[in-house]
Amino acid sequence: MILTTTHEIEGRRIERYLGIVFGEAIVGANVLRDLLAQIRDIVGGRSGAYEAELRRARETALAEMAEAARRLGADAVVGVDLDYEVLGSGNSMLMVTASGTAVKLAP
């Protein structure tokens, strides 16, 4: 499955547009990890735990979007966009949404 942020695929012709597809992932924050991240914010440095969670959420959202496209018979998803939103009381959750247009490519 080809996933691209562009609206065309170089060297390939889009035969049919199948519809908009989405994938979402919501991850909750861990209290201990939050505390360690706050300490890192004060002393500087990157939060590896948060980066890993963000990467996992992004990969999950993209995989769900690709699966939705497969169910429509798509060969690719063009115009892929990723959105990030903080949710929950105390902003304790992160939602990652992937969206794009499922397409069938000409042979």
Swiss-Prot record:
Domain of life: Bacteria
Pfam families to which the protein is assigned, alphabetical: YbjQ_1
InterPro entries hit by this protein: UPF0145_dom_sf (IPR035439), UPF0145_YbjQ-like (IPR002765)
SUPFAM superfamilies found in the cross-reference section: YbjQ-like (SSF117782)
Gene3D superfamilies named in the record: Hypothetical protein apc22750. Chain B (3.30.110.70)
PANTHER family (alphabetical): UPF0145 PROTEIN YBJQ
Family membership: Belongs to the UPF0145 family.
The protein's name in its UniProt record: UPF0145 protein TTHA1256
Species annotation: Thermus thermophilus (strain ATCC 27634 / DSM 579 / HB8)
Lineage: Bacteria, Thermotogati, Deinococcota, Deinococci, Thermales
